[in-house]
């Protein structure tokens, strides 16, 4: 229950801090300059909590293939007995960032701290006392630089590097984690935005998920398309080898009334959560969105 109270408190605290921003807009795509404060006109200073990735709550999420007995290529991290998880659960996705330093490295760079958390809650599963099936914690340190370039009609806006840690905070045999150095660049054109994020995994002596790169992948692309009252975005990963795994997640955010926004999500592939890094499934979720791109 403590985890439930923490998540609820986190949701309402962030909603309150973002209330003014949300109240000023419906569903619209923010420019990259707005999101990363690249120009003097968009700078808000340091230590101000702002949105990072979308913030939503899926009231219902269906899986074609629930991961009832997670396994790893490292035998110490394979679960010996299955748990009777439902195909239906709820999902939280919370994400925010804060600028720690600005105009560093010749007055061009900004240093950000980012945090993303997702939680999969078996709220409809009374048979196993409605547990949280999986929680993933993802803190980041992000060094971001403004840049100008042209690519296929798109205008490049940012270039940077980040240190990313992701874990589920659990004990053996459910523990999963990895550390990455991630490179990123973002570009935009009218109603479109594209972000590319290739990464390098850092070595882990006690590897809980040895083949994670061959399942989740070695890079990610995010494509966002925005129109009045609607926003569609795709997040895809790929290992860039002959295994042809990875994942694809398609999202639709739409205005219902005033600032109430609906959220539909469909995904396929591996690694929806860390415990599922080598488990393939198709999912569909329906809920509400508090903060979009």
What are these regions (language model features)?
Residues 1-21:
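Bacterial Sec-dependent N-terminal signal peptides
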Residues 85-88, 126-129, 169-177, 211-215, ...:
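Solvent-exposed loop/turn segments connecting transmembrane beta-strands
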Residues 107-111, 153-159, 190-194, 217-219, ...:
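Outer-envelope beta-barrel architecture signal
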Residues 21-167, 180:
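Transmembrane beta-barrel domains of Gram-negative outer membranes and organellar outer membranes
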């Amino acid at each position: 229950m403590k985890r439930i109270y923490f998540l609820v408190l986190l949701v309402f605290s962030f909603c309150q801090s973002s209330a003014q921003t949300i109240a000023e807009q419906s569903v619209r795509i923010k420019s990259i300059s707005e999101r990363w404060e690249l120009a003097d006109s968009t700078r808000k200073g340091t230590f101000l909590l702002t949105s990072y990735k979308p913030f939503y709550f899926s009231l219902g999420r269906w899986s074609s293939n629930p991961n009832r007995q997670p396994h790893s290529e490292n035998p110490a991290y394979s679960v010996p007995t299955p748990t009777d998880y439902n195909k239906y659960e709820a999902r939280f996705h919370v994400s925010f960032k804060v600028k720690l330093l600005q105009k560093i490295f010749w007055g061009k760079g900004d240093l950000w701290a980012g945090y993303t958390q997702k939680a999969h809650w078996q709220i409809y599963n009374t048979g196993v006392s409605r547990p949280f099936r999986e929680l993933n914690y993802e803190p980041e340190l992000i060094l971001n630089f403004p840049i100008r370039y042209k690519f296929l009609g798109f205008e490049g806006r940012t270039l940077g590097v980040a240190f990313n840690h992701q874990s589920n905070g659990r004990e053996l045999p459910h523990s999963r984690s990895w550390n990455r150095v991630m490179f990123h660049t973002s570009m935009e054109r009218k109603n479109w935005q594209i972000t590319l994020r290739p990464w390098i995994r850092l070595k882990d002596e006690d590897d809980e998920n040895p083949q994670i790169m061959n399942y989740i992948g070695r890079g990610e692309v995010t494509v966002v398309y925005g129109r009045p009252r609607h926003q569609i975005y795709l997040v895809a990963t790929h290992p860039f080898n002959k295994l042809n795994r990875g994942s694809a997640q398609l999202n639709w955010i739409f205005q219902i009334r005033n600032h109430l926004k609906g959220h539909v999500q469909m995904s396929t592939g591996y690694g929806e959560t860390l415990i599922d890094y080598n488990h393939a499934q198709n999912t569909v979720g329906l809920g509400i969105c508090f903060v979009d791109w």
